Design a protein with these regions (language model features):
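Acidic catalytic loop of the alpha/beta-hydrolase fold
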Residues: 277-281
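Conserved HGGG/HGGXW glycine-rich cap/lid loop of the alpha/beta-hydrolase fold
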Residues: 47-97
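Catalytic active-site module of serine/aspartate enzymes centered on a nucleophile-bearing elbow/loop
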Residues: 294-340
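Conserved alpha/beta-hydrolase catalytic His-Asp/Glu region
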Residues: 44, 193-264
Length: 340
């Protein structure tokens, strides 16, 4: 990875906590064939900030967001000596937005494969994974696929309906096949090509975002544009259709309970940072996870909603950094350094 190949977004300065943070680049992910599927090539947007010799930390965004959503903590982590990477997951941000015909259903299995390939090809060393919401499911999947490349995992928070509503009992193959066809038919009927552009240009984006925050976001125009911009792309509707189908038809092994069971024996350090006032994924879900998996640690962040990294970055980092100290010891950076 050559620093000369990386381009900073404009306007940009190392200290600025804006959605344009970091040096930006494009990466072509070649997804390997499986079960009759041919090679697929997708262009993915990613960014980096911090010293080249610093330990690696990868930030994975939530649903509807992108790498820019880490605007308030990425510069602070880089100042502490981390080399901070962030990736726009397939279908989000400035990465490609394939539909069902181009790439099939999109789910955390694919995003986990994408992140694993990113670690192997771009980061090129084991890293700490920090995810927000959907990014956590991707991080969990990556840790199962490539445990040798994940040093620790931070979930802020951990979403999955399967955590509160058990998966239905497994039906016969013919019944599952008809269920899949029926769901695909319904999803194809949804006029998302009309709905998504309308929502992207309406106040609904701000109203939906406000549900994820305790503080008012009315005047945070940068945050609103961060969500609106990818939704205005002509390929956004087809990608949303692929995600809706993919996340609805995930196999049991791709759900959070199954992934946690697989990680339970690996001794992977895992921390959950949960907003006290999270209206999307209530704190009770986090407490339930800890009761079932005592090896997972939970820290509650006061007066925060679903996006604590953006709502209260100082409280977020004050909870994160001591935990990294305890679990990574001498292999994490010490103190402030000059950013790249």
């Amino acid at each position: 990875m050559s620093a000369n190949a990386l381009q900073p977004a404009e306007p940009w300065c190392p200290e600025a906590e804006t959605s344009a943070w970091g040096f930006h680049n494009k990466w072509t992910w070649v997804r390997q064939p499986s079960r009759g599927r041919k090679n697929q090539q997708w262009t993915c947007h990613w960014r980096v900030l911090g010293p080249n010799n610093g330990p690696a930390l990868v930030l994975l965004h939530g649903f509807g967001a992108s790498s820019g959503h880490w605007r308030r903590i990425a510069p602070k982590l880089a100042a502490q000596g981390w080399q901070v990477f962030s990736l726009d997951l397939l279908g989000f941000g400035a990465s490609d937005q394939p539909g069902l015909r181009q790439g099939g259903p999109l789910d955390n299995q694919i995003w986990g494969q994408q992140t694993a390939a990113f670690l192997e090809e771009i980061v090129q060393r084991p890293a700490v994974l920090v995810g927000n919401s959907l990014g956590v499911l991707s991080a969990l999947t990556t840790a199962v696929l490539t445990p040798h490349l994940v040093r620790a995992l931070v979930a802020a928070p951990l979403p999955d309906p399967a955590l509160v509503q058990p998966m239905p009992r497994r039906h016969s193959p013919w019944r599952r096949s008809w269920q899949r066809r029926g769901l695909r038919f319904v999803v194809q009927l949804l006029p998302l090509q009309w709905i998504v552009p309308l929502i992207a240009r309406s106040k609904l984006i701000r109203l939906g975002l406000q549900g994820a925050y305790t503080r008012s976001i009315t005047n945070d125009l940068e945050l609103q544009e961060l969500i609106r911009r990818p939704a205005r792309r002509p390929t956004a509707a087809r990608a949303l259709r692929a995600m809706t189908l993919g996340m609805s038809l995930r196999p049991r092994g791709a759900t959070a309970p199954a992934l946690l069971e697989q990680l339970a024996t690996t001794r992977l350090p895992m921390l959950m940072l949960w907003g006290q006032n999270d209206r999307f994924i209530p704190l009770a879900v986090g407490r339930q996870v800890v009761n079932q998996h005592p090896w997972v640690e939970l820290k509650v962040l006061n007066d925060c909603g679903h996006c604590p990294h953006d709502e209260d970055p100082n409280q977020f980092l004050n909870a994160l950094m001591p935990w990294l100290d305890r679990n990574l010891g001498n292999s994490r950076p010490a103190g402030d350094v000059q950013q790249r």
